[in-house]
Amino acid sequence: NDLISKLAEVLKTEDIPAPSWSLFVKTGAHADKPPQKSDWWHTRCASILRKIYFHGPISVNELRTMYGDGKRNMYYGARHHKDASGAIIRNAMHGLEKLGYVEKVEKKGRVLSRQGMQKLDKMSTEILNEMIQKTPKLKIYS
């Protein structure tokens, strides 16, 4: 997704550092190994920001379910859902709150702040304009 990759690049330049433990952790009980990309933390933060934009207000628990996966027994049996790591999602949300892109709604979860909404809308418009340059038929969507 262009939006997530561009947003991840922007978040790298802003003050949202990856925790020191992010190099060693798996993303959940369903994962066999830690992520291979070194910038996975910023990509996950960008992805969380996008999910809050579409699904907010949303809780950490709901995001754990969305990012989780089915774990299959190696030899037999059905898939069983395993939630993603809550610490990763929680720390990413705290970083996004610090930047002012996300705010808490009591007993409901988190939503995008006005600043976060403007950031995503601006980036989406830039991406659409780039796509229109490549494919002029897309002009009907602007």
Label the model's feature ranges:
Residues 68, 94, 121, 125:
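Residue-level detection of the helix-turn-helix DNA-binding "recognition helix"
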Residues 1-46, 50:
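Long, low-complexity, charged/polar intrinsically disordered regions in eukaryotic proteins
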